[in-house]
């Protein structure tokens, strides 16, 4: 199983990154909370991975540290939560925020995440609460604001907004809802990652 990759970032298309390691390009899907922290194109990155095999695909999910990966592994053990939904959950809020919502049994906040209904939110609270005790506390430290790159002047605001909406759809939002969220927070000159982050915050 592939558990860790170290290589050069060739492409970034939220939530997907293409990482070249020893001449091989690996496509890795990351939660947006991890995607924001990636280095720029052409720079080296270290990604901790979870390899998932389905009938129709073999997928790699990536994380910035072992603790985030551990939380992802626990999430996909919950009945009704697959890798795609786990990715959406960890994109919609940080690990620290998710843990806080579960410990407070905050169903109202959890159901605002894409793909999470009331029953799923209740299962998350019941099944995840006791599992946090076995995870490293470093996972829940607040790392502060993340500095994001500015948008390229060659890319139009409309193209950036379309890319952000496409990323939200990949995370589980319906196309109309994704477009509505992006339109709500769009501002001239904003880059794609900022729009995605602001849209996810607005959804909560």
UniProtKB/Swiss-Prot annotation:
Entries under InterPro entries matching the protein: DNA_helicase_Holl-junc_RuvA_I, Hlx-hairpin-Hlx_DNA-bd_motif, NA-bd_OB-fold, RuvA, RuvA_2-like, RuvA_C, RuvA_C_sf
Keywords of the record: Cytoplasm, DNA damage, DNA recombination, DNA repair, DNA-binding
Region (Domain III) location: 156-204
Any single GO BP term: DNA recombination
Stretch list, region Domain II: 65-142
Main location: cytoplasm
Superkingdom in the source lineage: Bacteria
Compartments where located: Cytoplasm
GO CC field: cytoplasm; Holliday junction helicase complex; Holliday junction resolvase complex
Key word DNA damage present: yes
Region (Domain I) residue spans: 1-64
Residue segments, region Flexible linker: 143-155
UniProt-listed SUPFAM superfamilies: DNA helicase RuvA subunit, C-terminal domain (SSF46929), Nucleic acid-binding proteins (SSF50249), RuvA domain 2-like (SSF47781)
UniProt signal peptide: none
Molecular function GO labels: ATP binding; four-way junction DNA binding; four-way junction helicase activity
Pfam (any one): HHH_5
Function field: The RuvA-RuvB-RuvC complex processes Holliday junction (HJ) DNA during genetic recombination and DNA repair, while the RuvA-RuvB complex plays an important role in the rescue of blocked DNA replication forks via replication fork reversal (RFR). RuvA specifically binds to HJ cruciform DNA, conferring on it an open structure. The RuvB hexamer acts as an ATP-dependent pump, pulling dsDNA into and through the RuvAB complex. HJ branch migration allows RuvC to scan DNA until it finds its consensus sequence, where it cleaves and resolves the cruciform DNA.
Family under the similarity heading: Belongs to the RuvA family.
Subunit structure: Homotetramer. Forms an RuvA(8)-RuvB(12)-Holliday junction (HJ) complex. HJ DNA is sandwiched between 2 RuvA tetramers; dsDNA enters through RuvA and exits via RuvB. An RuvB hexamer assembles on each DNA strand where it exits the tetramer. Each RuvB hexamer is contacted by two RuvA subunits (via domain III) on 2 adjacent RuvB subunits; this complex drives branch migration. In the full resolvosome a probable DNA-RuvA(4)-RuvB(12)-RuvC(2) complex forms which resolves the HJ.
Protein name: Holliday junction branch migration complex subunit RuvA
Gene: ruvA
């Amino acid at each position: 199983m592939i558990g860790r990759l170290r290589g050069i970032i060739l492409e970034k298309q939220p939530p997907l990154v293409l990482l070249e390691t020893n001449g091989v390009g690996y496509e890795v899907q990351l939660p947006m909370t991890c995607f924001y922290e990636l280095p720029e194109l052409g720079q080296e990155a270290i990604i901790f991975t979870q390899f998932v095999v389905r009938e129709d695909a073999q997928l790699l999910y990536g994380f910035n540290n072992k603790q985030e990966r551990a939380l992802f592994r626990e999430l996909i053990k919950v009945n009704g939560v697959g890798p795609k939904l786990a990715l959406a959950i960890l994109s919609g809020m940080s690990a620290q925020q998710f843990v806080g919502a579960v410990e407070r049994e905050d169903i109202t906040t959890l159901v605002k995440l894409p793909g999470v209904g009331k029953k799923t939110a209740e299962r998350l609270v019941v099944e995840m609460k006791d599992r946090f005790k076995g995870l490293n506390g470093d996972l829940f430290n607040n790392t502060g604001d993340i500095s994001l790159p500015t948008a390229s002047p060659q890319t139009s605001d409309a193209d950036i907004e379309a890319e952000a909406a496409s990323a939200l759809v990949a995370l589980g939002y319906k196309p109309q809802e994704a477009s509505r969220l992006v339109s709500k927070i769009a501002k001239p000159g904003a880059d794609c990652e900022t729009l995605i982050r602001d849209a996810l915050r607005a959804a909560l």
